[in-house]
Amino acid sequence: MQTTFTELMQQLFLKLGLNHQVNENDVYTFEVDGHIQVLIACYHQQWVQLFSELGADLPTNDNLFGEHWPAHVQGRLDGKPILWSQQSLVGLDIDEMQAWLERFIDDIEQRKESQNTKFQPNSTSPILFI
């Protein structure tokens, strides 16, 4: 028997012990370490989708496929940079959902970290201007 999106989310949050909110459109929201907000939704009861705002200071990335499967795509929504990903609900179990969510959160953290260190010169290494 196929697990519904609602059942999958209930199992996930119970397993992870995370506090979450769900709105009237069945969009689940939770925070990671107080600085990353992740939204999880299901499109037409077929596609599970993950979303997170990246922050205004991150440049747009045109790498549509990325390093992960399912792909994590950086784009814009309402003028703000976001990271999103989706995969079919069919066959998605709790362990796969947890692993996907963990990779997604790791990707967000790496993108934010690389942006924070991108323009901070290391005082111990010389800067070469060409």
Swiss-Prot record:
One of its GO terms (biological process) is protein secretion by the type III secretion system. InterPro entries: Tir_chaperone. Pfam families: CesT. The keyword Chaperone applies. Keywords: Chaperone, Plasmid. CDD domains: T3SC_IA_SycT-like. Functions as a specific chaperone for YopT. Binds to YopT. This is Chaperone protein SycT. It comes from Yersinia enterocolitica serotype O:8 / biotype 1B (strain NCTC 13174 / 8081). The gene is sycT.
